[in-house]
């Protein structure tokens, strides 16, 4: 049985967000943070930038370029003590030493508050929500619609009433608004600040879940900008370590701390897409080159590139550029094994091979 503890610990060496009344902000130590693009930036983007995304309308072409391999819970298995599959965008299903969890579960056709506008999904998830294996817990990085899908959160909880949700500060109230973690519910929601951790116990094994700094922002409605914190996550088992960055700009000092204090990581899930134009996206989304630096700084043995090839995100890079650029850059690195940071096809199983 899974039995989350209520104890938590804090590492003061990690950066802390700035709290301004009801809202959060990135700290001044995040020197690459240039702020959230404003209205004038939006007009400049709309009228001066050319969209090079060019996603084909032909499904047959997409099936070749970005294959989706349909799987069920029965297919999600391995002899390895660490394996994972990419379910599209930032959703990664992981089995780490027998505990199963998912990052930012999103199944929506549109990453939006409405079904007729907003970022449209052009590659389907390889696994239906009802085909997920039994989950022990889930981590949510922030409240943007491409990372927090209310329908998926509720359906996962309905199927896994004992699941534990780990969320950054301010998000517990949102979860309770969905009926999750309220009085009388067997589902637990643990809200953490950057540098805080909580323990999860299953079958006598203890797993430590860390909430980690990320350079980003949050908003779901017109009047709730930055009311809920954003974060990355680390899951530490007895022998295996996993890191998920969430959406982030490049705050290299923090990434180095993650590697020194919690690494080396056996597997990391790092975003590589939605990064052009740089003047607009750099503060909030790393590009493939910066993703490789994150991979190195956190001392990841293996990383999977995510946050690409799923939704029309509004960025202007060619839709396959994140994958192709990552491979090109990794092939050119002499200090890193070129297979240590790769992309995988949706539904394919990645497994640690260093048993």
From Swiss-Prot:
Binds 2 zinc divalent cations per subunit. Zn(2+) 2 binds at residues 146-147, 247, 307. One of its GO terms (biological process) is N-acylphosphatidylethanolamine metabolic process. Its EC number is 3.1.4.54. Its cofactor is Zn(2+). GO terms for cellular component: cytoplasm; neuron projection; neuronal cell body. The keyword ATP-binding does not apply. Zn(2+) 1 binds at residues 142, 144, 216, 247. Predominantly expressed in the pharynx, also highly expressed in the dorsal and ventral nerve cords, as well as in the vulval muscles of hermaphrodites. An N-acyl-1,2-diacyl-sn-glycero-3-phosphoethanolamine binds at residues 145, 285. One of its GO terms (molecular function) is zinc ion binding. Disruption phenotype: No strong phenotype in the nape-2 deletion mutant, however its overexpression alters growth and lifespan when grown at 15 degrees Celsius compared to 25 degrees Celsius. InterPro entries: Metallo-B-lactamas, NAPE-PLD, RibonucZ/Hydroxyglut_hydro. PANTHER family: N-ACYL-PHOSPHATIDYLETHANOLAMINE-HYDROLYZING PHOSPHOLIPASE D (PTHR15032:SF4). Belongs to the NAPE-PLD family. This is N-acyl-phosphatidylethanolamine-hydrolyzing phospholipase D 2. The lineage of its organism: Eukaryota, Metazoa, Ecdysozoa, Nematoda, Chromadorea.
């Amino acid at each position: 049985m899974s039995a989350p503890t209520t104890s938590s610990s804090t590492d003061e060496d990690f950066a802390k967000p700035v709290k301004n009344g009801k809202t959060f902000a990135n700290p001044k130590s995040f020197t690459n943070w240039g702020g959230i693009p404003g209205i004038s930036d939006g007009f400049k983007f709309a009228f001066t930038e050319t969209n090079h995304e060019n996603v084909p309308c032909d499904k047959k072409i997409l099936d070749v370029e970005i294959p989706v391999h349909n799987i069920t819970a029965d297919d999600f298995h391995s002899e390895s003590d660490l394996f994972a599959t990419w379910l599209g965008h930032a959703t990664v299903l992981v089995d780490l030493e027998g505990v199963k969890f998912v990052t930012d579960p999103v199944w929506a056709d549109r990453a939006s508050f409405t079904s007729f506008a907003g970022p449209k999904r052009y590659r389907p998830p390889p696994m239906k929500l009802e085909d997920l294996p039994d989950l022990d817990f889930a981590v949510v990085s922030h409240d943007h619609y491409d990372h927090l899908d209310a329908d998926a959160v509720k359906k996962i909880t309905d199927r896994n009433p004992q699941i534990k949700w780990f969320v950054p500060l301010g998000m517990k109230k949102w979860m309770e608004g969905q009926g999750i973690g309220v009085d009388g519910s067997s589902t637990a929601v643990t809200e953490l600040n950057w540098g805080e951790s909580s323990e999860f116990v299953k079958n006598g094994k203890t797993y430590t879940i860390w909430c980690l700094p990320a350079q980003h922002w949050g908003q779901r409605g017109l009047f709730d900008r930055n009311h809920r914190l954003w974060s990355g996550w680390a899951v530490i088992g007895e022998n295996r370590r996993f890191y998920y960055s969430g959406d982030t700009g490049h705050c290299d000092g923090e990434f180095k701390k993650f590697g020194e204090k919690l690494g080396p990581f056996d597997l990391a899930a790092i975003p590589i897409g939605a990064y052009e134009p740089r003047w607009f996206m750099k503060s909030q989304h790393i590009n493939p080159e910066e993703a490789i630096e994150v991979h190195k700084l956190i001392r990841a043995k293996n990383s999977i590139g995510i946050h690409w090839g799923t939704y029309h995100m509004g960025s202007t890079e060619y839709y396959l550029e994140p994958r192709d650029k990552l491979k090109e850059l990794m092939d050119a690195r002499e200090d890193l094994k070129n297979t240590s940071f790769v992309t995988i096809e949706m539904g394919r199983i990645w497994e640690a091979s260093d048993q």
